[in-house]
């Protein structure tokens, strides 16, 4: 037995129907497309969302909301993630160095989620009341 002699068992595979190859095939002449009309032509599709000329649902519904530009440069950091920072000072640059936030982030808020056992000094970041209490309870401090 060689790789070039391998073949599926006889009768295990069915050849696909070949469209438009004579009336005896069952899919000759119109090839299963019926007669006339847009869908019988080549390239005869309608774009996604087209409803036959009726005002589409996407256009019938009102627009709402917007994307805040500040949210693109803001991030929340959990207390548990502060342990990943090497050193005892946590600021914007140290968070970026530890890959906790991306390089485009300009504003960070530390939130109470998870536990902190490490003594850290948080510099120049906003901190929630609960997170502040947890950091101070662990022996850390917050500097503006």
From Swiss-Prot:
The keyword Ribosomal protein is assigned to this record: yes
Keywords on record: Ribonucleoprotein, Ribosomal protein, RNA-binding, rRNA-binding
Keyword Iron-sulfur: no
GO CC, one annotated term: cytosolic large ribosomal subunit
Comp. bias intervals (Basic residues): 32-44
GO molecular function: rRNA binding; structural constituent of ribosome
Disulfide bonding pattern of the chain: none
Quaternary context: Part of the 50S ribosomal subunit.
UniProt family annotation: Belongs to the universal ribosomal protein uL15 family.
UniProt-recorded name of the protein: Large ribosomal subunit protein uL15
Organism per entry: Vibrio campbellii (strain ATCC BAA-1116)
Organismal lineage: Bacteria, Pseudomonadati, Pseudomonadota, Gammaproteobacteria, Vibrionales
């Amino acid at each position: 037995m060689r790789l070039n002699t391998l073949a599926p068992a006889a009768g295990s595979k069915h050849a696909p129907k070949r469209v438009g190859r004579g009336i005896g095939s069952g899919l000759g002449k119109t090839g299963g497309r019926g007669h006339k009309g847009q869908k019988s032509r080549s390239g005869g599709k309608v774009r996604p969302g087209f409803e036959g000329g009726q005002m589409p649902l996407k256009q019938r519904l009102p627009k709402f909301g917007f994307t805040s530009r500040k949210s693109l440069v803001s991030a929340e950091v959990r207390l548990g993630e502060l342990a990943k920072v090497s050193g005892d000072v946590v600021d914007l640059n140290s968070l970026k160095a530890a890959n906790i936030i991306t390089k485009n982030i300009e504003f960070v808020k530390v939130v109470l989620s998870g536990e902190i056992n490490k003594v850290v000094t948080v510099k120049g970041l906003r901190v929630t009341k609960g997170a502040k209490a947890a950091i101070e309870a662990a022996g850390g401090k917050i500097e503006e």
